[in-house]
Structure formats: structure tokens, C-alpha cells
């Protein structure tokens, strides 16, 4: 499969829906994870990503709770961390994977208990990925048989030896439509940029301006296991900690400067 420019691909696609990108940095020492959501209806657009640090992930929440019409299928945990295993999905199957892997089951075992979303006639696919401590990863899509709500098709993709500077992308939809056609084929292979900033900003700026809602990006250091996150939200949250972040502690030099200013005022 030929490598694509993922940013160009997304820029030319009005509505890929929700998407997962996993890649190994060009230096081979880091893994990148990206997950975005889009929306066409007011209910789908009324969302933000909010950190859930105690579970090593994020949740979706209503930007304005007063405008929330139907929480099913749009309020869930897209990202959770189990030890040094990072789980990302487009629905509540994140918790299914987390719970069953906690019991010693596999990624595939967990997803064999699930099917596509019950939102006919679209029957939105469930897309999922898991990144392991050594940088290997797996992806999956659970979709209907060409819109047949009585038939599920489960696809799994293993990447045990990821190549530095490359990644794979999968989305719920092929493109916009009515009903919306599901993603087809294996995950798309793409060239990975050098830094998480380039990766995240490239994805966010490439998504359709009208339909994009939120983006999450994570970098994982393969040696230490430490990770760092970036979150982009198009809409402001109402009554959320996102509106009032904690002020970081002042550096010693900043404290010294304030002390001098106070002395001058006296």
C-alpha cells in the first residue's frame, strides 16, 4: 500500500466522521496517537474532550449541557490507559476493551462481544486501536454488511513491527453521504511527521472547518513509558474546568521578580 499524506487526504474529505491515527515517530523512539470527532447535527457538535487523568484518558462531555438532546453514542471515554497499554476507540467499547483486557482477555476477544452502532440506516462502524508498551499496535473496525443491520463484519489489523516514520489511519466513514458510507478496506498507511505538535496541528488544521469538533493527540516515549497529551476543542465548554484551568506554580525567578516589585512599591 502506498503511503498517503494524511493531512491532504483529510483536507479533501468533508466528513470522514471519527478517525484514529497511530504512528511511530521518525526517530523510532516515540509513538503518536490521534483521535478526532466530527459532527453534522447540533447534538453531535455540542461536545468537547475533557481529561480524565485518574484513568489516563479523556471523556466526551456536552459543551452546553442544556442543549444535550441524546447522550447515547456521543458521550463516552474515547481514551483509557491500562498500565502501559493505550486504548482509543470511537465509543463505549473503550470500556469493554479495558475491562476484558484487565481480566486477561485480548483486544479481539473484547471486540467480538460488540457490534456496530445501532443508528440505522448509517450503522456507524465501531473503530478501535490499542498501542502496547513496545510500540506494537492493533486496529479494528466493526461494520455492517453494506448497510445490512442484521449482519456484522469484524476486521482486525496487527502491526507487530511498526516502521519508524509511518502510521495507519482508520475512520468511521468513507466520505459524506446519505446514508453515510462506511470506511472500506484496510487502514490507510501514512507518512508520520517528526513531532507531536506537527502531527496534531496538521490533523486539526486539515479537518473540515464546519464539521470538526475535537481532536486528541498523545505522544508515548517507548523507553520510559511516559506520555503527553494535546487537546483541541472547537467549542467552549459551559461550566467546565476547561474554562478555568489551574494556574501553574511560579518559577523561582518569577517569585524573585515579584518580591523585587513589592519592595519597590514599598
Regions found by a protein language model. Give the residues of each.
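Conserved short alpha-helical segments that host acidic/polar catalytic motifs at enzyme active sites
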Residues: 1-266
